[in-house]
Amino acid sequence: MSSCMLFFTVIIAGVFMGTIATNYCNLKSCVNYGNIHTMCKYTSSTPASTCSKWEKAGLTDAEKKTIVTLHNQLRRKVAAGKETRGNPGPQPAAATMPDLTWDNELAMVAQRWANQCKYGHDACRNIERFQVGQNVAIRGSTGENLSTVDQMILSWYSEVDLMNKKYVSSFPKDDTYKKIGHYTQIVYGNTKTIGCGRIFYKDGKWNQQYLVCNYGPAGNYPNAPVYQIKQ
């Protein structure tokens, strides 16, 4: 490994609203908005030609466990009223915030999108059961990419530093959400499941690691509470 390495991290949070039928290609909310579901648009389960020199795709069972465990540790911390950070903080305790469980369908759709190596959000990712939110992160290195999934998740969560506690009762509808959306999706009270995908690939001098996590039901609805505050 080179003794001199460059690193960068870019993260995005978002949500796409709508419901879908079992047949991804017949999703009305996609068609109505001129969009195509990820599973319909990209039919191959192998990485696309846009992933130049991809090395490996997917997550190990241990990494999946880490993703779920870390999310739940963070959710429990906030729910218990132990998160003192914010702008201003502290973050209020939650009346209820269930633990997340791993969802294979969410993971399948997330991996399909990751396999395109197109940084950003896919146009339509919902499943029949619920609407789906999404956090996306990419981390690059000029040497060996040793970033871990927990580091990428913690980078999302670090947006709590910018979270005004008043937004817990009403998620902002202006561009403020771009600064806090990763954090709020992680702790969204109505979200119960998570599924993620990941790929390593080469982009010029950068060795990229691209992580996509899908959440259901989705969070980050304007003017709606992030979670119910404990009275």
From Swiss-Prot:
<dbReference type="InterPro" id="IPR002413">
    <property type="entry name" value="V5_allergen-like"/>
</dbReference>
<feature type="disulfide bond">
    <location>
        <begin position="196"/>
        <end position="213"/>
    </location>
</feature>
<protein>
    <recommendedName>
        <fullName>Venom allergen 3 homolog</fullName>
    </recommendedName>
</protein>
<dbReference type="InterPro" id="IPR001283">
    <property type="entry name" value="CRISP-related"/>
</dbReference>
<keyword id="KW-0964">Secreted</keyword>
<dbReference type="InterPro" id="IPR034763">
    <property type="entry name" value="P14a_insect"/>
</dbReference>
<dbReference type="GO" id="GO:0005576">
    <property type="term" value="C:extracellular region"/>
</dbReference>
<keyword id="KW-0325">Glycoprotein</keyword>
<keyword id="KW-0020">Allergen</keyword>
<feature type="disulfide bond">
    <location>
        <begin position="51"/>
        <end position="117"/>
    </location>
</feature>
<keyword id="KW-0732">Signal</keyword>
<feature type="disulfide bond">
    <location>
        <begin position="25"/>
        <end position="40"/>
    </location>
</feature>
<feature type="disulfide bond">
    <location>
        <begin position="30"/>
        <end position="124"/>
    </location>
</feature>
<dbReference type="InterPro" id="IPR014044">
    <property type="entry name" value="CAP_dom"/>
</dbReference>
<comment type="similarity">
    <text>Belongs to the CRISP family.</text>
</comment>
<feature type="domain" description="SCP">
    <location>
        <begin position="68"/>
        <end position="215"/>
    </location>
</feature>
<dbReference type="Pfam" id="PF00188">
    <property type="entry name" value="CAP"/>
</dbReference>
<dbReference type="InterPro" id="IPR035940">
    <property type="entry name" value="CAP_sf"/>
</dbReference>
<dbReference type="InterPro" id="IPR018244">
    <property type="entry name" value="Allrgn_V5/Tpx1_CS"/>
</dbReference>
<feature type="signal peptide">
    <location>
        <begin position="1"/>
        <end position="21"/>
    </location>
</feature>
<keyword id="KW-1015">Disulfide bond</keyword>
<feature type="glycosylation site" description="N-linked (GlcNAc...) asparagine">
    <location>
        <position position="145"/>
    </location>
</feature>
